[in-house]
Amino acid sequence: MRYITAGESHGPQLTTIIEGVPAGLPLVAYDINEELARRQKGYGRGRRMQIETDQVQIVSGVRHGETLGSPIALVVENRDFAHWTKIMGAEPLTEQEEKEIKRKVTKPRPGHADLNGAIKYGHRDMRNVLERSSARETTVRVAAGAVAKKVLAELGITVAGHVIEIGGVEAKETTYRSIEELKSITEASPVRCLDEEAGNQMIKAIDDAKSNGDSIGGIVEVIVEGMPIGVGSYVHYDRKLDAKLAAAIMSINAFKGVEIGIGFEAAHRPGSEVHDEILWNEEHGYTRRTNNAGGLEGGMTTGMPIVVRGVMKPIPTLYKPLQSVDIDTKEPFTASIERSDSCAVPAASVVAEAVVAWELATALIEQFGLDRMDLIRENIEKHNEYARGF
């Protein structure tokens, strides 16, 4: 599977075209809208979320609630475009209209794509950069991820994300009895945190940052249960599943770090306290005593839950902006201010779910794939039976 997205933050719409989804997958707009609504929630979001109520339009590739095997086109309207029709319109402006427009950006924000992108593409108005580099684009990445999650769900695989740290406040209680319980607790939390006490402290940290004109980041974790053993590859570097997951997490706006399983903690332990001992029983076949590897060894799944964490830096748009330089005059100025969130970590956990789901669904279809969901399901069932008795 693959997809491409198009659209600017304040343009008329966001679009994604998805190729390679097997035929016979049950899919309706609600499946996608539910994920879009989750992305828009979360304590710390800005005023934009009060304007947009994201709803997807399925333009092609689905008929009567079932995928056809042909490309799927999804569109999400930007309601805020009504206020930006001249500024973001595709048609040329008159000289008078150009003078009247007040939205030209010449003061790049530290931490954003503004300056680097303007130099790369030769834009004197950095709005041409920030409109596309905005995290608004993750709307349609979540839409594509919703399709991938539907593929996984049909194959008995569950994806769940939660927040484990915001602004230096770390969740202490992160245990759960089942992945469904994890999902239930996090959906009820304004910051998508399993630890209620830590969640309240996270909310305070967000409030403090907002009152100071600042922003804060954090850490999200995605857990996946139900993956078969041996998905991915050790044969070539670019087919290693952990490498693909790491790249997917790092592709999310403002993410600066990723770890799998115990991650960097492995540097502090001897090998005897890192590697997961192998067990076997007649009912389940091969399992592990621990899951320090986070469900991945040698670029392949172990059959244990996949555990991936990502670090999100504070959003670079600050209401007390840092020093910058006007690219027209070269004089020092404070950076431009765009409407933004104080903290987008809870929402980012939903985006992280989406990109992880996409990589896993793609890997499964590559390994077991045919053009029909029923045949893929049969292939995985045969593989699981083979692995249990290996």
Curated annotation (Swiss-Prot):
HAMAP family: Chorismate_synth
Protein residues bound to FMN: 132-134, 253-254, 298, 313-317, 339
BP GO annotations: amino acid biosynthetic process; aromatic amino acid family biosynthetic process; chorismate biosynthetic process
UniProt superkingdom: Bacteria
Function: This reaction introduces a second double bond into the aromatic ring system.
Amino-acid positions noted as binding NADP(+) in the UniProt annotation, renumbered to this chain: 39, 45
EC number per UniProt: 4.2.3.5
Name of this chain's protein: Chorismate synthase 1
Similarity-based family: Belongs to the chorismate synthase family.
Pathway: Metabolic intermediate biosynthesis; chorismate biosynthesis; chorismate from D-erythrose 4-phosphate and phosphoenolpyruvate: step 7/7
GO molecular function, one term: chorismate synthase activity
